[in-house]
Amino acid sequence: MTARRARLTAVGWETDLVIESAADDPSPPAGSEIRVAVEACGICYRDIIDRDGRFPFIRIPITPGHEAAGRVIALGPDAKDFRVGDRVASMHREFCGHCRACASGSPSLCEFGASLFGLTIDGGYASELVAPERAFYALPATLPAPEAAILHCTFGTAYRGLARLGELRSGGSVLVTGANGGVGNAAVQVAKRLGAEVIAVVRNEKHVPHLMRLGADRVIVDAGAGFHKQIAQPVDVALDCVGPPTFNSALRSVRSGGTVVVVGNVAADRPQLNLGYVVTRGVRICGSAGAARHDMAELLQLHAKSPLSIR
């Protein structure tokens, strides 16, 4: 069957994606590259802002999509991590694998400018995807492709933010803003499986029943930025999945010596930061995006023990 791909030929919503045929006789993967037959590719908020043209470095034309899952169908001569037939999912980006950040397990901070699927290199809206093997991680045979495709972007982001940067442990407590979104839903579930007390924050009460089913111990409905006033006991970690509108209240929700992990930045405005409050309370503020291979391996172990609702 002829391979096909979607192409974005201009940013903005006036131009439709173009479906075109790829080469009938594609060149074999080079070096450590692998060729993956794509079984599913997710659509998330970043795909929307990619198409909006909010990233000036986007390469046009390009094949969008950074949440791909599928099966390895060909290997480059230097590929060692996978075999033909293995199930894999993409890591959002291609990175060098050798710099200090990559070597320390933080490939999203690659010092040599990681290439981004769907922005600077062709992504997963295609029959096949070719990239270095380090841009993929292994999947279990039992995880359906549609769930596997979105696992890294939502649950991987939540897991790394909570377990790695937030150092959330059993018996701890966490507050999640934007809990009704994809990463927020994932964070509620991940935090609960890590043994934490979970407070979710949303703007609309219609989300309350669903979040309680996912494991939230309490859901605060607050359309403003004063939800910290509704918390009796400051939390160990706040995972801010929104950005400027919720940041300051999230900051004031954590205990002295606690951590605010920022994974959301959906608003263009800038938060007002009281540095004196940060200094005197000893609060850590971390930014995080995506996850590393070892994060995904741990997350998949967590899922095997207590299945997550991935959707």
Sequence positions of predicted segments:
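NAD(P)H dinucleotide-binding glycine-rich loop of Rossmann-like/cofactor-binding domains
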Residues: A37, E94-G178
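Short N-terminal strand-loop motif that marks the start
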Residues: M1-A69, A131, V219
